[in-house]
Amino acid sequence: MKKSINEQKTIFIILLSNIFVAFLGIGLIIPVMPSFMKIMHLSGSTMGYLVAAFAISQLITSPFAGRWVDRFGRKKMIILGLLIFSLSELIFGLGTHVSIFYFSRILGGVSAAFIMPAVTAYVADITTLKERSKAMGYVSAAISTGFIIGPGAGGFIAGFGIRMPFFFASAIALIAAVTSVFILKESLSIEERHQLSSHTKESNFIKDLKRSIHPVYFIAFIIVFVMAFGLSAYETVFSLFSDHKFGFTPKDIAAIITISSIVAVVIQVLLFGKLVNKLGEKRMIQLCLITGAILAFVSTVMSGFLTVLLVTCFIFLAFDLLRPALTAHLSNMAGNQQGFVAGMNSTYTSLGNIFGPALGGILFDLNIHYPFLFAGFVMIVGLGLTMVWKEKKNDAAALN
């Protein structure tokens, strides 16, 4: 019988710390992007491609990672992902040419592909269906907290040198990996892993993609793509937009992102479980998409620090509530295919994170408002998809 979350506090703290560390490193780069852009004489499109390189790497690796999570165990994949992440941040901190930055982001994508499905599957393994949405909410809160500390730490530590934040991220990732070696235990027995492996050993990327377009999964995965596409397009150019339009410094940008993230994560932790129980996952997803779309359009006419802060707070909140609602929905339908579903979730996220930043950077070079208009349009498309989304509770088990 599975234990409650309260009975497994140490395990949850380690898991949440690991996912926090991964997204901390991503958050670190946000406030220093304009400075890197100026120092390296890079265009907005190049910055977008740099973000997209991370996602391309994650996309290519995710299907394999999803199967390896089932075959080799969650713990091994988490530790390996953290070690690769540590190396990628160290390389970025030492880099002196844009090609080195690309290589670093590619390694970062591999690490994310390892860590995300492993942590998600681990949480699903040790939680009951009743507590799973709550647990996924904690995972999403850890991600959000990474964005809270990341930009804040990046803006502060950059005062000691623009590369120092990356050395810091590398060090704490290494510490997290070592801690996981000694504290985490495999969530599944060898027999259970063999059973899962028997389902996945003949699997391949094309086959997994074909499985993902089954009506049980497809609309949910497309919404994952839409969410990642719109949010990544917004996030990629936000710091550049703030620098170009308002002349915000790295500390200003860090303050906006940090405060917005704190507000979002506090509300998420306090209200997510209650809202999902009252509205249901589907209505929660729809509410978040329409809120995000409206605020993306509002972003093009906002002015002044306080207005930017207010709009950003609500956009972060919308996506911080959307992410766990989607993850919980997919996890609940996955049955004994947690590794596959988590891996494909990461795959569709990567697809959105490839095209969103790349197109966002190109649109930014044309007009600094275009990325926000486009992000809003994409979220409206996602909202439309949820209107034809029919939830089928038992079909996923039949696919296993």
From Swiss-Prot:
The membrane topology of this protein is: Multi-pass membrane protein
Q: What does this protein do?
A: Energy-dependent efflux pump responsible for decreased drug accumulation in multi-drug-resistant cells. Probably uses a transmembrane proton gradient as the energy source. Causes the efflux of a variety of toxic substances, including such structurally diverse compounds as ethidium bromide, rhodamine and acridine dyes, tetraphenylphosphonium, puromycin, chloramphenicol, doxorubicin, and fluoroquinolone antibiotics.
Q: Which UniProt keywords apply?
A: Antibiotic resistance, Cell membrane, Membrane, Transmembrane, Transmembrane helix, Transport
Q: Give a GO cellular-component term.
A: plasma membrane
InterPro entries (UniProt xref): MFS, MFS_dom, MFS_trans_sf, Multidrug-R, Sugar_transporter_CS, Tet-R_TetA/multi-R_MdtG-like
Entry protein name: Multidrug resistance protein 2
Where it sits in the cell: the answer is: Cell membrane
Task: Enumerate the transmembrane spans.
Answer: 11-31, 46-66, 78-98, 106-126, 142-162, 164-184, 213-233, 253-273, 297-317, 346-366, 368-388
Read off the SUPFAM superfamilies from this record. Answer: MFS general substrate transporter
Family annotation (CDD domains): MFS_MdtG_SLC18_like (cd17325)
- Pfam families the UniProt entry points to: MFS_1 (PF07690)
Biological-process GO terms, alphabetical? response to antibiotic
Family label: Belongs to the major facilitator superfamily. TCR/Tet family.
Q: State the encoding gene.
A: blt
Q: Which organism is it from?
A: Bacillus subtilis (strain 168)
The GO terms this record gives for MF are: xenobiotic transmembrane transporter activity
- What is the disulfide pattern of this chain? none
